[in-house]
Every structure is written in structure tokens, then in C-alpha cells.
């Protein structure tokens, strides 16, 4: 990795939130910050139509204006800019972030009930890159995110005990340790479908299954507790839909961390339903970490 954070800009109101969060995170990490803007050329059959000159000038001004503002507020940061045109924005962002530690994108709020829009570029970029992607919220048209990278609140991690969680745990533990805040690890689970046919469920069965999951989670976390002895770990095994349990735990979180399986299926990479729900409904910044 290059000790660099890349943030994608598209000129929307969510840009300010994403750039501010990325700048705070870069200060926490002692990392450089790269501002990236990509313009797609219009497609007409096999031909592409270059952008008009005013649009190119606007893109250059967007990058320079954002850089100048961040330097006024974070004078010690090393900030670079990169603009490109003619390629799909998701491809450009994924390529720019290939050797970065983090890619930061904005998402726009629709209100407390509707949730957030993760734009088409963001949705296309996340499956394209193995770099962790953080989605930063802009609420109700406001430019500022609800939480900056250094704000109080725990880091909340959603895990699936059936998957390899090492990369998620490494990312979440490091983020919580960097912020000197607790790490809440949540695993939501449901009873196997066969139990739905039982007229009366033996309460001992549910307890036995929950105890087994708690043991599994404790064993999973043990090496990380040794690696981060100062980290306050709160492990939770909760009966219920995983996305709902993660969102409940994420209220007031500094950062929410969820996973995305690294897959290359014939129909293309995708984002799983739990991560998709958290991306669209968590009010805190959401980190999507690719894992095996």
C-alpha cells in the first residue's frame, strides 16, 4: 500500500462530506490524500463524443477548489488531484484506488425512512476494487457528514461466522485502535428453517445454539484481543436478521464495517444483500471491505 487515501468527486453535494471525512481520516493515518474526478464521454454506438470545453474547465475547477479548501482547513496534508475523461468513472476510481489504503465516496440522504442513495458510480465501483471503500453520508442535502473520522462513537463490525473474517477484523481493529474507541462485533443469526415447523420450541435448543455461536465468536476474536490489548471489544450474538442487528448496533457509530465476498462470477461481481442494506440505511460512514 502507498499510505494514501483516494476520494472520488462528482460535483454533488455529497462531495464535501466525502472530502472532509477523507481529510480527517488522512490526518489520523498520517497519509496523503488524492482527489479524483472522472468524466464519461457520451456514447453513440461505437463512437464517443468528447466533452465540451466548459465541462472540462468545470471539472478542473472542482478539483482545484476542493484542494484549496481542504488545504485551508488541513494545512499539513499532502493533497494531489487527478482528473481523467473518456473512461467509465467506476473503472477510473477502481484503478486510482488499486494501491491506495482507502477509497472514499459520497452518498446522498433521502431522509430517515428512505435511507441513502449510493449512486450508480459508487455501486459499480465497489465490486470493481479490492481496496476498502468508505461511503460517507450527506444528510438531507447538507454538505457535512454526520460524523468525522475522529469523532466519538464505536466502530461496529458485522461478521458472518461461516466466512473468513480475518481481513474485516484486521481493518476494524485497526480503525478502532486508531480512534481509541470500542469495537462492537455483531453476528446476527436465525434458527434453522426446520424449527419453524415445531409446534413448541424447546428454549434449551435456542440457548444451546446461541452458546455455541458465542464460543465460536470468542475464539475468533481471541488473537485480535492479544494483538490489540488496549482495545475494548464488545462481542454480540443476536437472534434476528443480520442487517437489522448491525443497523441497530450502528446507531451513533463512528464507522460501520461490513464485508463483500471477492467473487468473479460469469455475470460479474456483486454486493450481498446484508451489505447492500447496511450501505443504504446506516447513517454513519460505512466501510465495505472485500474478503475471501
Write out the residue ranges for each language-model feature:
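Short glycine-/small-residue-rich Rossmann-like dinucleotide-binding loops
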Residues: 10, 67, 108, 160, ...
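Small/aliphatic-rich secondary-structure junction motif
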Residues: 1-52, 151-203, 225, 232, ...
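Gly/Ser-rich helix-loop-strand patches that form or flank binding pockets
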Residues: 19, 24-28, 95-145, 250-292
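General small-molecule cofactor/ligand-binding pocket signal
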Residues: 34-36, 80-84, 134, 184-186, ...
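A conserved short alpha-helical segment within the catalytic HATPase_c
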Residues: 63, 67, 218-222
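Structural beta-alpha unit
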Residues: 1, 14, 71-103, 110, ...
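A short acidic, glycine-rich active-site loop
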Residues: 52-62, 203-213
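Generic structural signal for helix capping and beta-alpha/helix-loop junctions
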Residues: 43, 143, 193, 245, ...
Amino acid at each position: 500500500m502507498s499510505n494514501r487515501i483516494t476520494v472520488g468527486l462528482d460535483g454533488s453535494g455529497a462531495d464535501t462530506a466525502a472530502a472532509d471525512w477523507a481529510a480527517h481520516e488522512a490526518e489520523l493515518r498520517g497519509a496523503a490524500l488524492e482527489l479524483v474526478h472522472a468524466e464519461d464521454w457520451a456514447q453513440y454506438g461505437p463512437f464517443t463524443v468528447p466533452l465540451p470545453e466548459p465541462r472540462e474547465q468545470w471539472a478542473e475547477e472542482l478539483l482545484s477548489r476542493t484542494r484549496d479548501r481542504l488545504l485551508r482547513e488541513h494545512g499539513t496534508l499532502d493533497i494531489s488531484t487527478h482528473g481523467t475523461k473518456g473512461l467509465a468513472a467506476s473503472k477510473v476510481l477502481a484503478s486510482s484506488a488499486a494501491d491506495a489504503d482507502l477509497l472514499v465516496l459520497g452518498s446522498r440522504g433521502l431522509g430517515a425512512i428512505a435511507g441513502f442513495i449510493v449512486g450508480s458510480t459508487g455501486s459499480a465501483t465497489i465490486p470493481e476494487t479490492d481496496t476498502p471503500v468508505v461511503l460517507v453520508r450527506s444528510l438531507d442535502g447538507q454538505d457535512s457528514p454526520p460524523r468525522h473520522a475522529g469523532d466519538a462513537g464505536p466502530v461496529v463490525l458485522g461478521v458472518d461466522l461461516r466466512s473468513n473474517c480475518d481481513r474485516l477484523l484486521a481493518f476494524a481493529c485497526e480503525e478502532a485502535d486508531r480512534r481509541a474507541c470500542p469495537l462492537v462485533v455483531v453476528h446476527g443469526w436465525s434458527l434453522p428453517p426446520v424449527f419453524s415447523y415445531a409446534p413448541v420450541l424447546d428454549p434449551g435448543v435456542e440457548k444451546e445454539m446461541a452458546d455455541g455461536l458465542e464460543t465460536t465468536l470468542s475464539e475468533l476474536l481471541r488473537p485480535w484481543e492479544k494483538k490489540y490489548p488496549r482495545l475494548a471489544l464488545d462481542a454480540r450474538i443476536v437472534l434476528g436478521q443480520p442487517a437489522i442487528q448491525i443497523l441497530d448496533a450502528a446507531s451513533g457509530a463512528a464507522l460501520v464495517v461490513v464485508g463483500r465476498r471477492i467473487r468473479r462470477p460469469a455475470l460479474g461481481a456483486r454486493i450481498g444483500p446484508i451489505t447492500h442494506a447496511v450501505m443504504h440505511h446506516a447513517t454513519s460512514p460505512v466501510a465495505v471491505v472485500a474478503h475471501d
